[in-house]
Amino acid sequence: ADPVWKVTSTTTVFNSKVSTDVSYRVPAVAVTKAGTILVFCETRYGTWMDKSGRTDIFMKRSTDKGATWTEKNITEQAVSSKLSYMDPTVVVDQTTGKIFLFTSLWDAVGKPSAQQGYNNRAIMYTSEDDGVTWTRKDLTDEVQIGIYSGFTRMIGSFGPGSGVQMTNEMYKDRLIVPMRSFKVDADKGTVSNGGNTAMYSDDHGVTWQTGQPNKSGEWTVTEAPDGAL
């Protein structure tokens, strides 16, 4: 029989009512190999709107099953920054214990690229100490999609939400991260939705590849008992 989940208590991890200066959007949750709970969220300064200026990715971390939390600003931008880190997406390698956090870096507010996304960067943060410290890497050149169906497809954003580590024997330990693309029409000078795709790694996150895009938008992923996604 399917398990029955019962709500025994609730906890507000991020609360915009505490401060009038920030809004919290787009949460992502993971449980590490050690059982630590990690919750990530966009922290938008001054407004709740998308791509409206400085946006950081904050993390709340609990080692006691959610009773208490510590906070960390993962992206740590300067107060004067107008860049937006958006759509946190997290996946944990339960074999190695390594944690991967992905986020898209959007251009400075006020530039056309800030709305259309054609200068977006694919950023990966990794932690090998259960989420205490993080290392940043720009993956953009490694995972760009390139030409598909006659159009250039560029990094749009990730998930948002969570990735998955496969348990099916054929693809065991494969890490899969949902992502979205933009389609560039050079003749028309336009950038539009290029469909979603997935980024995946078969070497525990050392290298990453992207699949072919299909027609849809934001999405997330889970593995069914038969190994289907």
Task: Kindly label every feature range from the protein language model.
Residues 2-229:
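Asp-box/BNR beta-propeller blade signature and adjacent active/binding-site loops
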